[in-house]
């Protein structure tokens, strides 16, 4: 029988000093012996996805204490990728994932907490907390801040839906007037919450549902809606039950590694492919699997991508649907229900509520449930009122979207595409693979061949695109932007957005060892592995080389002979200390980022730290 970890600091005469300090935080004799549960919050005024979280930790804490636990809250950092985008700030985004994971480990282990409720939301915060949870392997429940409402504005006498990406594209489009650009900017992000499309934040919050670590509705129920409060109340109560099950009943099924099993990871990736999630999710699932000591690799993702269809299409792949529409159609559970009926899921998995997949679907799938309260929850909709307050409105759709032939979520028979929303490509400069969000690629360019235009920084590529140096038919190659080479593996949302602004969204391809925002669409291929800074063959591409992309056959090929590539590699190696570094790039890299780069692996490994360099 495991004993409470917290007993280390609360029991025994030799812990008098620790108890004295606990008393100074408000604990009493009656609390020593209760489970200490960390409320891992991520409130910050820098990020719209986290600006409303200040009081939500207290909400969870009250429920923990009412259920017989002791709640202790702390915050992690949170970087807003949209605000950090397009300048040196983006170098810090992916490395912040490791800092978040480490900081959670540090706080929880230093104070011997017994369990956690993780209040996350945006791009690197959910993955960082997920990595920490699987590393620590103590009871945990995730409850995120929820999605932002979609923006809406009237253009050309028509009401259209908007998001962050629209503001970026129109702001750079010389054909768009200043007044229209300003109108879109002011309308694109109307409320608190994670940006309203199927971008990285919302993708990851959906995947925590599929992994079983959060409650139904977590990924899609709007941040502003009053119904979302119940998820926080439930999390506080339920975590005490899970904690007591493990420590008092020796029930290891309450632990995250037993909930987020390999079968659950396969289900999460299947969901990701079916909903056309962000390519960043691949990076984060690979990293989380390593923390869980699960053998889940690019090969597994490749196999799944070849058999899973696309059943949901959401911004940025279409402007018709945003997360509020996914929720109306049944949310994550609605998509999982269609995947289950197609025989594409592992059914022998459980979630933090203790429900198996069939039980979860029976209770929460809008196509199956007889529970009017569940149906009412999925009718929770937007209010269209600018606010930074959680739970500030209670508007509802008149009806659910249960049209599986033409609605937001489709059945297998009416899939948007027989091929899923993500694909792994392999070739002679991506020997370990690269990722493309096929959900955002127009059918006309699924096969594409063109000459390379090579840039050794995102900044140079942006300057060339906006300066008219990139033309229709080109393949833009941005290298030395991987985890090690950047360092930090910057997102390339500005280059892809500016290609659209210049009318080249369906006329060019972009390939990088960096990564893309969840807001990216178009023929954008990232995570090329090995990266250039690690001796990857992407570092051998020269201007004018022909590159052939074949998404249907999962191929990507540099049309240069093996002999020529060998000669180029020899010349690169001969540069000595300058080998596999950019030739003409001035970039200030801090000590913190250099430390990150010294241990970073390529994207096919999840861009995690290379444990072999630490002797582990």
Swiss-Prot record:
The active site is at 517 (proton acceptor). Keywords: 2Fe-2S, Amino-acid biosynthesis, Branched-chain amino acid biosynthesis, Iron, Iron-sulfur, Lyase, Magnesium, Metal-binding. One of its GO terms (biological process) is L-valine biosynthetic process. It comes from the Bacteria. GO terms for molecular function: 2 iron, 2 sulfur cluster binding; 4 iron, 4 sulfur cluster binding; dihydroxy-acid dehydratase activity; hydro-lyase activity; iron-sulfur cluster binding; magnesium ion binding. InterPro entries: Dihydro-acid_dehy_C, DihydroxyA_deHydtase, DiOHA_6PGluconate_deHydtase_CS, ILV_EDD_C, ILV_EDD_N, IlvD/EDD_N. Binds 1 [2Fe-2S] cluster per subunit. This cluster acts as a Lewis acid cofactor. One of its GO terms (cellular component) is cytosol. The modification N6-carboxylysine is found at residue 124. Mg(2+) binds at residues 81, 123-124, 491. Its cofactor is [2Fe-2S] cluster; Mg(2+). Pathway: Amino-acid biosynthesis; L-isoleucine biosynthesis; L-isoleucine from 2-oxobutanoate: step 3/4; Amino-acid biosynthesis; L-valine biosynthesis; L-valine from pyruvate: step 3/4. It is an enzyme of class 4 (lyase). It catalyses: (2R)-2,3-dihydroxy-3-methylbutanoate = 3-methyl-2-oxobutanoate + H2O; (2R,3R)-2,3-dihydroxy-3-methylpentanoate = (S)-3-methyl-2-oxopentanoate + H2O. Coiled coil: none annotated. Homodimer. Belongs to the IlvD/Edd family. This is Dihydroxy-acid dehydratase. It comes from Escherichia coli (strain K12).
């Amino acid at each position: 029988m495991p004993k409470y970890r917290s007993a280390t600091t609360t029991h025994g005469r030799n812990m008098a000093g620790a108890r004295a300090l606990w008393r100074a935080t408000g604990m009493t004799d009656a609390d020593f012996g209760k489970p200490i549960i960390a409320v891992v919050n991520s409130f910050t005024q820098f990020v719209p996805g986290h600006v409303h979280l200040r009081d939500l930790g207290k909400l969870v804490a009250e429920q923990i204490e009412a259920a017989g636990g002791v709640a202790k809250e702390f915050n992690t950092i949170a970087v807003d990728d949209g605000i950090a985008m397009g300048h040196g700030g983006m170098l810090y985004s992916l490395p912040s994932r490791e800092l978040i994971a480490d900081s959670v480990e540090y706080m929880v282990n230093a104070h011997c907490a017994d369990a956690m409720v993780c209040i996350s939301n945006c791009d690197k915060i959910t993955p960082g907390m997920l990595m920490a949870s699987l590393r620590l392997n103590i009871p945990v429940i995730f409850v995120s801040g929820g999605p932002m409402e979609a923006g809406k504005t009237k253009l050309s006498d028509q009401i259209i839906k908007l998001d962050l990406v629209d503001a970026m594209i129109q702001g750079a489009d010389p054909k768009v007037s200043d007044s229209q650009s300003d109108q879109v900017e002011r309308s694109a992000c109307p409320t608190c919450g994670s940006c309203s499309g199927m971008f990285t934040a919302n993708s990851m919050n959906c995947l925590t549902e599929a992994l079983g670590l959060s409650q139904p509705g977590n990924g899609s129920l709007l941040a502003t809606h009053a119904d979302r409060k119940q998820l926080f109340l439930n999390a506080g109560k339920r975590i005490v039950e899970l904690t007591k099950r493990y420590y008092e009943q020796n029930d290891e099924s309450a632990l995250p590694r037993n909930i987020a099993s390999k079968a659950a990871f396969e289900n999460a990736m299947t969901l990701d492919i079916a909903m056309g999630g962000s390519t960043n999710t691949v990076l984060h699932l690979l990293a989380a699997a390593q923390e869980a000591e699960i053998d889940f690799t690019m090969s597994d993702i490749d196999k799944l991508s070849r058999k899973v269809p696309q059943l949901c299409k959401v911004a940025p792949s279409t402007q018709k649907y945003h997360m509020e529409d996914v929720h109306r159609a049944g949310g994550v559970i609605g998509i999982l229900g269609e995947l289950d009926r197609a025989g594409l899921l592992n059914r022998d998995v459980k979630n933090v509520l203790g429900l198996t997949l069939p039980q979860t679907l029976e209770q929460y799938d809008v196509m199956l449930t007889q529970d009017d309260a569940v149906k009412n929850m999925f009718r929770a909709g937007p209010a269209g009122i600018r606010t930074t307050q959680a739970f500030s409105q209670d508007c509802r759709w008149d009806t659910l979207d249960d049209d599986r032939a033409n609605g937001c979520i489709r059945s297998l028979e009416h899939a948007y595409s027989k091929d899923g929303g993500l694909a792994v490509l392999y070739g002679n400069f991506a020997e370990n693979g690269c990722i493309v969000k096929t959900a955002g690629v127009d059918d006309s360019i699924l096969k594409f061949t063109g000459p390379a235009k090579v840039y050794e920084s995102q900044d140079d590529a942006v300057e060339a695109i906006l300066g008219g140096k990139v033309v229709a038919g080109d393949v833009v190659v941005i290298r030395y932007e991987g985890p090690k080479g950047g360092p930090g593996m910057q997102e390339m949302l500005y280059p892809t957005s500016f290609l659209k602004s210049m009318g080249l969204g369906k006329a060019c391809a972009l390939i990088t060892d960096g990564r893309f925002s969840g807001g990216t669409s178009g023929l954008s291929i990232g995570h090329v592995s090995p990266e250039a800074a690690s001796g990857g063959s992407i570092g051998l591409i020269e201007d004018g080389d022909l590159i052939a992309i074949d998404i249907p056959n999962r191929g990507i090929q540099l049309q240069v002979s093996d002999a020529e590539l060998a000669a180029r590699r020899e010349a690169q190696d001969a540069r000595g200390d300058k080998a596999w570094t950019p030739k003409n790039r001035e970039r200030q890299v801090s000590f913190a980022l250099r430390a990150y780069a010294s241990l970073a692996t390529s994207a096919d490994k999840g861009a995690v730290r290379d444990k072999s360099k630490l002797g582990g």
